[in-house]
């Protein structure tokens, strides 16, 4: 059964804007980011997603863990990060439309943190803030059936991937299939669904914007709960995705020195190219500046003419 939601004018406008920005990303070769930028964005993703859940480690500490350096911090926080690093490094090994793959990802993400890692919950749960019960999840014996239906929905080829990713994220949070780790799994799986059609999402840290607008994130979940459909959450998440793509494009269009431009371009891995190809990546560059850049690259033995 298809989960309930409405396509509002705001959703249509955001989908149009996102599609245009993805086109610009592809035209600028931004799906092939430099290794350094990919690493930075991966760190932001892990830091932001875990920060939402109360993890106290900084981006610098996460960088150190990626580089196999020792970090002093709460044991639980360190383990959460180490698990997340392993999972995000093998993102393309998971199948977004498979519940078995979903459970495997949860097992690896929560390994050593809870006894029931990789298993759906076998007890009732509710989300309490202060003294107020914010959300009572469906009975535990309904969880396998509800999740099976949700994964069937993911296989619907008529649904837009952008919409599907948001709907899955919301419905999964509503079902609350695990005792712990639901939030980080929702964000991880939305990334995976988006990656199935758009390569840029493998390294687009939209979680950073969720972390900065956390109150709006939870408000959109609550409003969707109250209305009985995921429309509010879809609007929120599409807005986050649109702004994250805008940030990526702004970063690419920033003022760079010739060495920075050359380094960035070389990291794209384009083996044979001409001045026009170079200028396609750096849209605001004059032909004279592009020629000077490429001449400098030859003089530095970074390029062959």
Residue ranges of model-derived segments:
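FIC/Doc superfamily catalytic core
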Residues: 1-305
């Amino acid at each position: 059964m298809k989960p309930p939601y409405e396509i509002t004018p705001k959703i249509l406008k955001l989908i149009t804007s996102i599609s245009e920005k993805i086109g610009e990303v592809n035209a600028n070769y931004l799906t092939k980011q430099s290794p350094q930028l990919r690493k930075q964005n991966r760190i932001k993703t892990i830091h932001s997603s875990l920060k939402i859940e109360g993890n106290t480690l900084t981006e610098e500490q996460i960088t150190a863990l990626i580089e196999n350096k020792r970090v002093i911090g709460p044991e639980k926080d360190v383990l959460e990060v180490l698990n997340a690093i392993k999972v995000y490094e093998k993102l393309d090994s998971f199948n977004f439309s498979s519940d078995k793959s979903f459970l495997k990802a949860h097992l690896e993400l929560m390994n050593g943190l809870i006894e029931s890692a990789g298993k759906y919950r076998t007890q009732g749960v509710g989300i309490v803030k202060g003294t107020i019960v914010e959300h009572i999840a469906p009975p535990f014996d309904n969880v396998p059936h509800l999740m099976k239906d949700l994964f069937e929905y993911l296989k619907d080829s008529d649904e837009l991937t952008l919409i599907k990713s948001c709907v899955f994220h919301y419905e999964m949070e509503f079902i609350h299939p695990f005792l712990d780790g639901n939030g980080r799994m929702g964000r991880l799986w939305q990334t995976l669904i988006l990656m199935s059609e758009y390569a840029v999402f493998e390294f687009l840290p939209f979680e950073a914007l969720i972390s900065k607008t956390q109150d709006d994130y939870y408000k959109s979940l609550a409003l969707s709960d109250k209305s009985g459909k995921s429309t509010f959450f879809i609007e929120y998440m599409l807005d986050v995705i649109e702004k994250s793509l805008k940030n990526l494009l702004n970063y690419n269009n920033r003022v760079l020195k010739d060495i920075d431009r050359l380094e960035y371009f070389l990291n794209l891995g384009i083996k044979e190219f001409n001045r026009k190809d170079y200028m396609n990546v750096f849209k605001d560059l004059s032909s004279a500046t592009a020629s000077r850049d490429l001449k400098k690259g030859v003089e530095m033995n970074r390029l062959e003419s």
